[in-house]
């Protein structure tokens, strides 16, 4: 299965039980910041943004004072899972990033999608990739 198929079929899909509700943007990115696959409307990811995210996975709390920046958008960092998941909030939307052995699975949402729904979609794929050794 191609990385693009994971984005299209597992991240940009309808939320379970909520037809028509889906993430706004999604991407799978290598730990080095290289984009493996992304939704059609994903922004350009800057190297300094990816460096900050990877630093936060290695040093939880690193992004809390400055916020999480991705694609030029700033998110307030909210409780995640140290070393495994970073979550952010901006207005009525937000972001979830799940770290796997080789990649970062990113999902961005806006209402009516809820933070919990975004977490479920992103973390489910991330957990699957971890189980596959990826």
UniProtKB/Swiss-Prot annotation:
Phosphothreonine sites (modified residues): 114
In terms of PROSITE patterns, this protein maps to: PROFILIN
SS bonds (residue pairs): 13-118
Primary localization = cytoplasm
Which residue ranges does the UniProt annotation give for the motif Involved in PIP2 interaction?
84-100
Name where it's found: Cytoplasm, Cytoskeleton
Give the free-text PTM comment from the record. Phosphorylated by MAP kinases.
Give the domain of life.
Eukaryota
Tell me, what is one Gene Ontology molecular-function annotation carried by this entry?
actin monomer binding
Q: Which UniProt keywords apply?
A: Actin-binding, Allergen, Cytoplasm, Cytoskeleton, Disulfide bond, Phosphoprotein
Name the Pfam families on file.
Answer: Profilin
Q: Does the keyword Cell inner membrane apply?
A: no
Q: Which GO terms describe its cellular component?
A: cell cortex; cytoskeleton
Remarks, miscellaneous: The variability of the residues taking part of IgE-binding epitopes might be responsible of the difference in cross-reactivity among olive pollen cultivars, and between distantly related pollen species, leading to a variable range of allergy reactions among atopic patients.
- Show the PANTHER family listed in the entry: PROFILIN (PTHR11604), PROFILIN-5 (PTHR11604:SF25)
Q: How does it assemble?
A: Occurs in many kinds of cells as a complex with monomeric actin in a 1:1 ratio.
Function statement: Binds to actin and affects the structure of the cytoskeleton. At high concentrations, profilin prevents the polymerization of actin, whereas it enhances it at low concentrations.
The entry sums up its family as follows:
Belongs to the profilin family.
Entry protein name: Profilin-3
